[in-house]
């Protein structure tokens, strides 16, 4: 009797390891790693128009190109 139980357990374990066993829905939430948005160099235009505040700050920090209201880039 113990041999039968052991064989059934091993067979079911082998099926699960091969992906042939229970194929239910994934029950845990999928966690996405936090990735900082990367601003491309193309976003740092010379006119400061059409870019977001975040992109403007990034351009100022990384490249020294800082937007000022109605003045365009300085630096």
From Swiss-Prot:
<keyword id="KW-0027">Amidation</keyword>
<keyword id="KW-0929">Antimicrobial</keyword>
<dbReference type="GO" id="GO:0050832">
    <property type="term" value="P:defense response to fungus"/>
</dbReference>
<feature type="disulfide bond">
    <location>
        <begin position="60"/>
        <end position="67"/>
    </location>
</feature>
<feature type="disulfide bond">
    <location>
        <begin position="48"/>
        <end position="66"/>
    </location>
</feature>
<dbReference type="GO" id="GO:0005737">
    <property type="term" value="C:cytoplasm"/>
</dbReference>
<keyword id="KW-0295">Fungicide</keyword>
<keyword id="KW-1015">Disulfide bond</keyword>
<keyword id="KW-0147">Chitin-binding</keyword>
<dbReference type="GO" id="GO:0031640">
    <property type="term" value="P:killing of cells of another organism"/>
</dbReference>
<comment type="function">
    <text>Antibacterial and antifungal activity. Presents chitin-binding activity.</text>
</comment>
<dbReference type="Pfam" id="PF05927">
    <property type="entry name" value="Penaeidin"/>
</dbReference>
<feature type="modified residue" description="Serine amide">
    <location>
        <position position="74"/>
    </location>
</feature>
<comment type="similarity">
    <text>Belongs to the penaeidin family.</text>
</comment>
<feature type="modified residue" description="Pyrrolidone carboxylic acid">
    <location>
        <position position="20"/>
    </location>
</feature>
<keyword id="KW-0732">Signal</keyword>
<protein>
    <recommendedName>
        <fullName>Penaeidin-3k</fullName>
    </recommendedName>
</protein>
<keyword id="KW-0873">Pyrrolidone carboxylic acid</keyword>
<keyword id="KW-0044">Antibiotic</keyword>
<feature type="signal peptide">
    <location>
        <begin position="1"/>
        <end position="19"/>
    </location>
</feature>
<dbReference type="GO" id="GO:0042742">
    <property type="term" value="P:defense response to bacterium"/>
</dbReference>
<dbReference type="GO" id="GO:0008061">
    <property type="term" value="F:chitin binding"/>
</dbReference>
<dbReference type="InterPro" id="IPR009226">
    <property type="entry name" value="Penaeidin"/>
</dbReference>
<feature type="disulfide bond">
    <location>
        <begin position="44"/>
        <end position="59"/>
    </location>
</feature>
